[in-house]
Amino acid sequence: MLQCTITTRCAAAMAALLLLAAPAAAQGNSSPEPGHALEGAALVRALRGGGYTLYFRHTATDFSQHDRAMTGYAECATQRNLSDAGRAQARAIGEAIRALGLPVGEVIASPFCRTMETGRLMFGRAEPSTIVRGYEGTSPANADYARLIALLASPPAPGTLRMITSHGNPFRAVAGPPHLGEGEAAVLKPAGASFVVVARIRPGDWAGLAESEREK
């Protein structure tokens, strides 16, 4: 058991212990892993077979707005919301996914307005869950990402893809840098008690995936 008598030394020791206790995935890098990376037509074929989770950061937002104290997640006036460009972006990504014939299964969203709207515009539905946010409200003071890691490590229903629309910070916390851009998706493959990143798809990449299918 750690015992501390000097406040500054105690704080430093506790910080070190917290780093050691952090999820292993967060100590790495969320770029596609060598030996697992997929792109182009090979990525499309893999996604059509199901078995992956696509973790999206919400699409483009209006940064003149800010998250403030709120009484409930449906209180959109106190949150940063999608911009018109972000709404168009979400619709376009959803259309590309349908055009590629990808088997969309469950759609899970952080309960914030921007993430729920992203899911609904992409897929026509979204089930709110704080698991993909990692904590309640706007403060990460009590963040617990263990359930998010467990979700990402679990396979979706057979033959389907699990779609998540959430935020950049939770993904960085469990997978490491680089940070997801707005509208960017990480493609994750379950790997025992964790997961591996096999691809990252930026909003503008979907057209290239469709083109790779036509050229195969």
Model-derived features: positions:
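Generic beta-sheet signal
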Residues: 51-53, 160-166
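A short, structured loop/turn motif at beta-sheet edges
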Residues: 154-160, 190-193
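Active-site-proximal alpha-helix that buttresses catalytic centers in soluble enzyme cores
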Residues: 28-130, 135-139, 177-196, 200-216
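Sec/Tat signal peptide C-region and signal peptidase I cleavage site
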Residues: 22-26
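All-alpha RGS (Regulator of G-protein Signaling) helical domain and cognate RGS-like helical scaffolds
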Residues: 132-139, 145-153
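Bacterial N-terminal signal peptides
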Residues: 11-21
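N-terminal secretory signal peptides that target proteins for export/translocation
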Residues: 1-6
